[in-house]
Amino acid sequence: MVYDIEYDVVVIGGGHAGIEAALASAKLGTKTALITIDKEKIGLMPCNPSIGGIAKGIVVREVDALGGEMAKAIDQTGIQFKVLNTRKGPAVRSPRAQADKEEYRKYMVNKTNNTENLTVIEDEVIDIVLKENKNEVDGVITDKGLKIKTKAVVVTTGTFLNGLIHIGDKRFPAGRMEEKPSTKLPEFYKRAGFELFRFKTGTPARLDKNTINFSILEEAPGDNPPPKFSFWTEPKGSYWFKEKDQIPCYITYTTPETHRIIKENLHRTALYGGAITGIGPRYCPSVEDKIVKFEGKDRHTVWLEPETRDGISIYPNGLSTSLSEEIQWQMYRSIPGLENVVLLKPAYAIEYDIVMPTELYPTLETKRIRGLYHAGNFNGTTGYEEAAGQGIVAGINAALRALGKDEPFIIRRDEAYIGVMIDDLTTKGVIEPYRLFTSRSEYRLHLRQDNAILRLYQKAYNIGMLNEEEYKFVKETEEEIKNWINIYKETFIKDGDKKVSIFTYLQKPEVDIQKLKEMGIAVPESDYIQEEIEINVKYDGYLEREEKLNEKMKYLEGIKIPEDIDYSQVAGLRKEIVQKLTKFKPMTLGQASRLEGITPAAITALLVHIEKMREKRKTG
């Protein structure tokens, strides 16, 4: 094929996965093209106007630690900030922010259009071209007829592949409301042998702020001081804004009348009327799903969230539905404060195609086709944050392939929630839209929101995602934390009638850094360093115990499975285990150990076989 132009990496889709993939690829020095149907909708928030939440907020900080953009964007455009789970331990706390979705979109449009090595192309990719051997990417073809040669393609199409919107008994093709779906690219996947599955998600109506009676509703303000997401937002090296003007949300509830309206019209919903075949998200159900599944509950919480700082659009979090539009008006008006509400846009459900993520390596490259990467909703996940986490990993690996680097970029389960998510996706697959929770991790005490930068800065620096100045700053911060902890271990004070180290004294539940300061004991100036010291001191024993449990997994993750292994030649493996390993192609013994049905005995047999393969290669 004769190509019109050449890029090292092509990213398809300008959502939250595509943005991080494209920016990461460009940052690593590859000539990158971001191809999207509408370049003014890069970074659009089609559902909730927020970033972060339980586990999700930790992922945003991990993306930031890896050199990504989402955290910086929300810090600049957020209108309310808070930390969730503050009554619980630090392992499960997460930041969350309400976004001005228009300002967020503008920020990302500007960023992608003004990044070195990155070109934004307004077009639709309708086909992916393979080399003659049929298992490696060679280029893409667009709807406008542009033929682009490339070494790697990252597909981040969100809900656009064969997207179908449902509003009651009405349905029509769309990728998002008022945007056309991608119907030609799925044909490539069918030809290439990928099986496509149908998933479903939904979004509530948008409400006119001027028609809501806020005076009778419960106000939900942000935190003071407000938490920020990026380690690099001023004041640099802190996770707290000095000042940030915030806008409140409001809380209301469904009523028995709401539930009656929904129950009487269940047959008119796309979900219960049988029109939807796709599988929906368990942890973000439609309101009709909640009414059916939690029949004994007399009310459900609704959060009224502003979509912009100065606009009139309100997002009623908790009220997504596929009811017909006329019934939606009745339902929304049965809720306190919304008696006279006007709907700006109706709620809708959307079905779309995904590829099972077990088709991928932990690099997010497909096993079938070299140079083809998937990220975001297309992998069966839900949420902007999960998409961004996958996007940055896919973008980094696509760039490394384009640059001819042999060592892939892989994040382990013990290193980050991004690693937990990707490992879950690639080893277990999905039976419903995947959402990240802290409970999915075995290493919650280590994978906290406060230490994301400390966990990942070395990996980011090693591949070029952090510069020298950034690396030096984090390194010095880490050294200062260690130095203060050592000082506290070596300095003794009187506690009643006995002498104890400051370290031991700080482990007492009633003692914090502020108490030490009041006692005249020196403490670091940085609020971030104070927080890190206190967490590390108070959880010292638990962290040590978790680290010991982690050692075995690290050992198994360190043993790579040769690409040319023939599982049928491994002594002692049952036939079904041979079939599973051959199908999933795990990259390490650690990944193999997490596949369903793989026994400890099978791992031992694999270890012995791999050692024999190594010895054979040494002796020639």
Swiss-Prot record:
Q: Which domain of life is it from?
A: Bacteria
The record's principal subcellular location, in a coarse class, is: cytoplasm
Tell me which cofactor or cofactors this protein depends on.
FAD
Cross-referenced SMART domains, in alphabetical order? GIDA_assoc_3
**Signal peptide interval:** none
Assembly: Homodimer. Heterotetramer of two MnmE and two MnmG subunits.
Which family would the database say this protein is a member of? Answer: Belongs to the MnmG family.
Role this protein plays: NAD-binding protein involved in the addition of a carboxymethylaminomethyl (cmnm) group at the wobble position (U34) of certain tRNAs, forming tRNA-cmnm(5)s(2)U34.
Protein's name in the database? tRNA uridine 5-carboxymethylaminomethyl modification enzyme MnmG
Instruction: Give the organism the record lists.
Output: Sulfurihydrogenibium sp. (strain YO3AOP1)
